[in-house]
């Protein structure tokens, strides 16, 4: 065991280094080749804000519209994310420059925003909304800053550039609100190798925008929809007065630049993080610390157990041994079925379902099959996998329920299929009603909700029943000792054996292993960032499984040594103790990182956080429970019982 613990951290470290070599490569999407002057379609995705957490579709604001609005057919994941991809009137041609062009309106007739439209635009700007566009499925990014470099190395300068996703709708200054009504698009292309008798082809490899606010009086437009921007700082920004009508032009320009970025690396701009070094060192530190502590805990348990088992198996000292306190004294009660075995087995079945789903999703994403360029693929895959993993959840729940002397398998199967999913659906439905009330694109449409219910009752529930049926018919787990008819009296327990104290103690190590990844995941969810470090996430998931298992074994061992055989529910709750720290961290993140002040955004945050904490508790509790159950069966099978 000690030898195994010696090489395990190094092998995992090597594995994580291997994952880094392809961490930012995004396969799975075929490139599109453009010829000179081919149209490059600019589409809008949505409007987002980290302050409100309510996405809106692009045309919820009075932007210029094309002659025919066409929405893209979306998958389940895109709908759940609030994406509403739609065409826009921007006319962009491959490698064709445009200095300035009026998007809608005429030289003598600018766009007029009504009082209601002006109020809505001003409200969205004050709520710090971002606009998200895509060109050739590549999201638009805004260049934030360029650090100076004394050596003048352009490549090094390029690495120091920071980007944010989308562009700001506008800005406020001295209680006045200004709209970004001119967009300077900068598109980078990579020239493909020229074949014989064929013209050059190009691929879009980066999409940037420089948003500007230009006052109506400073723009000069002609009858051909061309315009002239003021030079330098001679212009004033376009103010939006929410109390009256506002007139303005929506304009844009297009600039093309050749780039040596290859198509396979074009997502690096969005996936590279500025603090990646901190991320690396934190992950490595977590690996070393967690496995070092896990090794120590394992050695303590193994050495203590060897001594206990050796003493218990000495026939000469058997009477002295039985007079001592220890885990062997509760051998006749340790496998006594707990209260509410149906609920316990149902929760553990849902935990198995979650475990299988998360493991497969992370592994497939680590291989690059669920790239950000395939919008909504991650969430769609997770939903369908959870449905189909119901057969494994039902099987494990059915077998455990029979082991716990349960008899009503049909009711147990229904409980497994509906308890956790029902809570999730109920919370999501209530939150969705509030989102509907705000007319947000984040609200799940009624047909999609019906489709989800059909998937639940048409796929998940039958599969859970099928798995439960076979699990209940299978031979129950073989417990190595018989259960006494009369329960043993439990002595008074010390304060540190309290259930809540156990939750606090058991949750520290697993939470410490995943703390850094949790920060990046929260940033991706609540601050509209991309997350693609699934190599790291897979490593952290393995660490989480190992640490939860080892901590669970330690906790159940000390509980049995205290002659308390009621370990079933307690171990399930204590093993999920890291979920308590996730909740505490979520509150800390809300207070210190987010600028949410309104009721509905706060309700959404804590509603979805509650679902996350519940799911994480089920996951870690299930991992710890089965590790402890295997451990208990193993140690009682190793001693002689008279």
Curated annotation (Swiss-Prot):
Task: Tell me the Gene Ontology biological-process terms attached to this UniProt entry.
Answer: cell adhesion; phagocytosis; positive regulation of protein exit from endoplasmic reticulum; positive regulation of protein localization to cell surface; protein localization to membrane; regulation of intracellular pH; response to hypoxia; vacuolar proton-transporting V-type ATPase complex assembly
Query: Which first-to-last residue range defines the signal peptide?
Result: 1-23
Q: Which residues lie on this side of the membrane: Extracellular?
A: 24-281, 368-376, 438-449, 523-535, 592-598
The UniProt keyword set, sorted, is: Endosome, Golgi apparatus, Membrane, Phosphoprotein, Signal, Transmembrane, Transmembrane helix
Compartments, as annotated in UniProt: Membrane; Golgi apparatus; Early endosome
Tell me which Pfam families the record gives.
Answer: EMP70
Q: Which domain of life is it from?
A: Eukaryota
What taxonomic lineage is listed for the species of origin? Eukaryota, Metazoa, Chordata, Craniata, Vertebrata
For membrane topology, the record states: Multi-pass membrane protein
Give the species. Bos taurus
Q: Which residues carry this modification: Phosphotyrosine?
A: 312
- Which is a Gene Ontology cellular component entry for this protein? early endosome
* Positions in the Cytoplasmic compartment: 303-346, 398-416, 471-501, 557-570, 620-642
Tell me the function of this protein: Associates with proteins harboring glycine-rich transmembrane domains and ensures their efficient localization to the cell surface.
Which pairs of positions does the record mark as disulfide bonds? Answer: none
For this chain, the family text in UniProt reads: Belongs to the nonaspanin (TM9SF) (TC 9.A.2) family.
Q: Which residues cross the membrane?
A: 282-302, 347-367, 377-397, 417-437, 450-470, 502-522, 536-556, 571-591, 599-619
Name this polypeptide is given: Transmembrane 9 superfamily member 4
């Amino acid at each position: 065991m000690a030898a195994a613990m010696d090489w395990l951290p190094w092998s995992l470290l090597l594995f994580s280094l291997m994952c880094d070599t392809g961490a930012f490569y995004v396969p799975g999407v075929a490139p599109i080749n453009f010829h000179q002057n081919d149209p490059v379609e600019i589409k809008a995705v949505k409007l987002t804000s980290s302050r409100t957490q309510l996405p809106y579709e692009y045309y919820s604001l009075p932007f210029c519209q094309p002659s025919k609005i066409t929405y893209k057919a979306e998958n389940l994941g895109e709908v759940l994310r609030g994406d509403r991809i739609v065409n826009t009137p921007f006319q962009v041609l491959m490698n064709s420059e445009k200095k300035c062009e009026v998007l809608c309106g005429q030289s003598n007739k600018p766009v007029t925003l009504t009082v209601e439209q002006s109020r809505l635009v001003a409200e969205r700007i004050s709520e710090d909304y971002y606009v998200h566009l895509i060109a050739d499925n590549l999201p638009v990014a805004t260049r934030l800053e360029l650090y100076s470099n004394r050596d003048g190395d352009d490549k090094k300068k390029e690495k120091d550039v920071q980007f944010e996703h989308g562009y700001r709708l506008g800005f406020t200054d001295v209680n006045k609100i200004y709209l970004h009504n001119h967009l300077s698009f900068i598109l980078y292309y990579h020239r493909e190798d020229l074949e014989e008798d064929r013209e050059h082809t190009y691929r879009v490899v980066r999409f940037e925008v420089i948003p500007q606010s230009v006052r109506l009086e400073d723009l000069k437009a002609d009858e051909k929809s061309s315009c002239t921007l003021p030079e330098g700082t001679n212009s004033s920004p376009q103010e939006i007065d929410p109390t009256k009508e506002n007139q303005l032009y929506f304009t844009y320009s297009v600039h093309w630049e050749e780039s040596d970025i290859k198509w396979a690396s074009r997502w690096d701009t969005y996936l590279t993080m500025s603090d990646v070094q901190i991320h690396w060192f934190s992950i490595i530190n977590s690996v070393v610390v967690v496995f070092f502590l896990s090794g120590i805990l394992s050695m303590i348990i193994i050495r203590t157990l060897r001594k206990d088992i050796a003493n218990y198996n000495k026939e000469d000292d058997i009477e002295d041994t039985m007079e001592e306190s220890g885990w062997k004294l509760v051998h006749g009660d340790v496998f006594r079925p707990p209260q509410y075995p149906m609920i316990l087995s149902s929760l553990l079945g849902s935990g198995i379902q979650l475990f299988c789903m998360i493991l497969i999703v992370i592994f497939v994403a680590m291989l690059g099959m669920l790239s950000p360029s395939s919008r909504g693929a991650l969430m769609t895959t997770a939903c369908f996998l959870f449905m189909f993993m119901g057969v494994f959840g039902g099987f494990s729940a059915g077998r455990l329920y029979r082991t716990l002397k349960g008899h009503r398998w049909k009711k147990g199967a229904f409980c497994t299929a509906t308890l956790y999913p029902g809570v999730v659906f109920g919370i999501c439905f209530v939150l969705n009603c509030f989102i509907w009330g705000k007319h947000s694109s984040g609200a799940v449409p009624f047909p999609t909700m019906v489709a989800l219910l059909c998937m639940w009752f048409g796929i998940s529930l039958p599969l859970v029943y099928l798995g439960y049926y076979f699990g209940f018919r299978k031979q129950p787990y073989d417990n190595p000792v018989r259960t006494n008819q009369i329960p043993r009296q439990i002595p008074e327990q010390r304060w540190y054996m309290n259930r809540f104290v156990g939750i606090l103690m058991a949750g520290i190590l697993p939470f410490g292993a995943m703390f850094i990844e949790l920060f990046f995941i929260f940033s991706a969810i609540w601050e509209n960032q991309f997350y693609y470090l699934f190599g790291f996430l897979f490593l952290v998931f393995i660490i989480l499984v190992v640490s939860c298992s080892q901590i669970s074994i330690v906790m159940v061992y000390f509980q049995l040594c205290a002659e308390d055989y009621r370990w079933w529910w307690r171990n399930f709750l204590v093993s999920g103790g890291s979920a308590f720290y996730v909740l505490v961290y979520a509150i800390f993140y809300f207070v210190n990182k987010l600028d949410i002040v309104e009721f509905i955004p706060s309700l959404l945050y804590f509603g979805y956080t509650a679902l996350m904490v519940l799911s994480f508790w089920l996951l870690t509790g299930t991992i710890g429970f089965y590790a402890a159950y295997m451990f208990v069966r193993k140690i009682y099978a190793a001693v002689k019982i008279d």
